[in-house]
Every structure is written in C-alpha cells, then in structure tokens.
C-alpha cells in the first residue's frame, strides 16, 4: 500500500479548504506523506496568533465580500484570490522536514522554467531586474508526532488588492498580536506568461512523486465529496465561525474618538477573546447619562459591529429624547469597528 496521498480541492471556499487540511492532519497515519493542493477565492488569511482588526481593513473586506480565515499555523496575514495556488505537505515525524517540501516546490518551479531560491525562513524568491521578488510564502505547524508546511505561489494574483485589505485603517490599537511583515512580491506570470493553476499543480505533483519514487491517484474533493474525513462537519463549523476567525484574536485595546455637533466622545475598549472586558466613555456632552449607561451595557458585549449597534439602539427605550444623538453614535461605532 502506498504511503503517499494526493488531494486536490475543487472548492474555492477558504473555510472548507482549511477544515479539510485540519481533518487530514489530525487523522493521517504517521507513516503517510500527504500533498494537498487548493486555492481560495477572495480571502484574507491570518496567522493563528494575529489580530484581524490590527492586520486587516475589515470594513473594506466586508464591503467587497472578502472573507476572513484564521489558519492553525503561525505567521502573518496574506490575501488570497484565484491567482494564488496553495499547497500543503504533511508527514509524520521524524520524517517531516520542511526542507524536503521546500525542495519539491523549487524543483517544480525549475521544471516550469523558473529559477527560484529559498530566502530566510519562509519565502521563495526570484531574481528580477528590480531585485529579488517574493513569489511564495509559507507557514508551518508541528505536533509531537507530525508536522505540515503550507504556502502559496503567486501566479497571477491581483497585487493591487493586497494593499486594499492588508493595510488597516489607522485605528488606535495597542495590540499584542503578531504584526505581518510586508515583502516585495511578483507574479509568476511576469516570468512565465500564461502559466495556469493546473500547470503549477501538475508540476508540484510530479516533483512530489519523483522525490518519493511512487505515484498515486489524486482524490478530488469538494463540499459534495469529502472522502475519509472524520469529524469534518464539526471542524468546518469551527473554521467558519466568528468565534474562531475573530474571537481568537489576542487581547487588545481600542481607542475611538469623534466630535459630534452635540459634543465630543472618546471610547476606550479592552477586548479579550472577541468580547469587551472593559468599556470607558468620556464626553463633554451636556447630557452624558446615555453614554454612561452605554459603558455599562457594552461590558461583556461581542466586539462586533452589529452587536455594538444593537446595544446603542437599546438605550432609546430609556433615553428617547436623545434619539438623534444615540443614532449618530450607533452608526459611528458600527462603522469604526468593522
């Protein structure tokens, strides 16, 4: 029986693909070597320890229907579209070795006619007239008996959109999460015009087979066909949940301030696990009572725009004469935390 397993995803759903990856990793035999090839439609993927409000322009993501997905490995934030090819190599220990998977990807690129080299701990770069440019970034995860190396190759990604979603609003966030390091990048189409996802997948697959000296049939997976993936429904539910993608952010503080016609407002939030643990409100409004009441209501509230808006509007019952002010406040807060 072959020790290799090759899976190719037909889905562009990042939550589906990351859930598949997690399930395979958890249940694979320690003797198995796995290659999983996939890609995501418009998504910002953040590292396990990152703060999405610090890393991403969450408001613009929501406006443009760009998903957020938190992966189980460390590292920084990246933007995925269908111009990226994603790969995951898995193996049991002691065989797991990220230098092997890196060499497989380099051999695949070489077979396609691209001379690339490893740079630092996580990147593959090519030489261009403008200097070295990154074409691949990676992240890793290890447990006591297995490990995986996953990464992306930039084929024909819309690089202008990287800045749209990975440059956050100038929020006053004093956060403890890991900050992404920005790198100069280029697409493989600059070197190989017309290169496709299918060609890259085939090259990586052939390099994978060549390294291990055996071949297997590919398993094509999709939301309608998830072979041999125990507990997939539960894993997908977690991967797609707000609690995982947003709520797992490291503790941080957020300061918001705005001046309205009726007075200035300053809000201080401490947030842990996606919940407000402390809310302070400062104002020079002539009627501070509704704002003081809001501070109490926000304690324990989910740090989500719709939930904050709901708490603001709930105050209309007790302070109907301040309806105009409360609606202005509600709209502002909801926009500020998206």
Curated annotation (Swiss-Prot):
Provide the top EC class. Answer: ligase
Residues reported to bind ATP: 71, 76-79, 134
Which GO MF terms are attached to this record?
ATP binding; lipoate-protein ligase activity; lipoyltransferase activity
Limits of the BPL/LPL catalytic domain: 29-216
Q: Which GO terms describe its cellular component?
A: cytosol
Q: What is its EC number?
A: 6.3.1.20
> Under which pathway is this protein filed?
Protein modification; protein lipoylation via exogenous pathway; protein N(6)-(lipoyl)lysine from lipoate: step 1/2; Protein modification; protein lipoylation via exogenous pathway; protein N(6)-(lipoyl)lysine from lipoate: step 2/2
Q: Which reaction does it catalyse?
A: L-lysyl-[lipoyl-carrier protein] + (R)-lipoate + ATP = N(6)-[(R)-lipoyl]-L-lysyl-[lipoyl-carrier protein] + AMP + diphosphate + H(+)
Record-listed (R)-lipoate binding positions = 134
Checking Gene3D superfamilies in the record gives: Bira Bifunctional Protein, Domain 2 (3.30.930.10), CO dehydrogenase flavoprotein, C-terminal domain (3.30.390.50)
**What Pfam families does the record tag this protein with?**
Lip_prot_lig_C, LplA-B_cat
- Keywords recorded for this protein, A-Z: ATP-binding, Cytoplasm, Ligase, Nucleotide-binding
Compartmental location: Cytoplasm
Provide the GO biological process annotations.
Answer: protein modification process
Q: Please name the InterPro entries in this protein's record.
A: aa-tRNA-synth_II/BPL/LPL (IPR045864), BPL_LPL_catalytic (IPR004143), Lipoate_ligase_A (IPR023741), Lipoate_protein_ligase_C (IPR019491), LipoylTrfase_LipoateP_Ligase (IPR004562)
Family membership: Belongs to the LplA family.
Task: List other remarks.
Answer: In the transfer reaction, the free carboxyl group of lipoic acid is attached via an amide linkage to the epsilon-amino group of a specific lysine residue of lipoyl domains of lipoate-dependent enzymes.
Query: What is the stated purpose of this protein?
Result: Catalyzes both the ATP-dependent activation of exogenously supplied lipoate to lipoyl-AMP and the transfer of the activated lipoyl onto the lipoyl domains of lipoate-dependent enzymes.
Q: How does it assemble?
A: Monomer.
Q: What PANTHER family has UniProt attached to this entry?
A: LIPOATE-PROTEIN LIGASE, LIPOYLTRANSFERASE 1, MITOCHONDRIAL
Q: What is this protein called?
A: Lipoate-protein ligase A
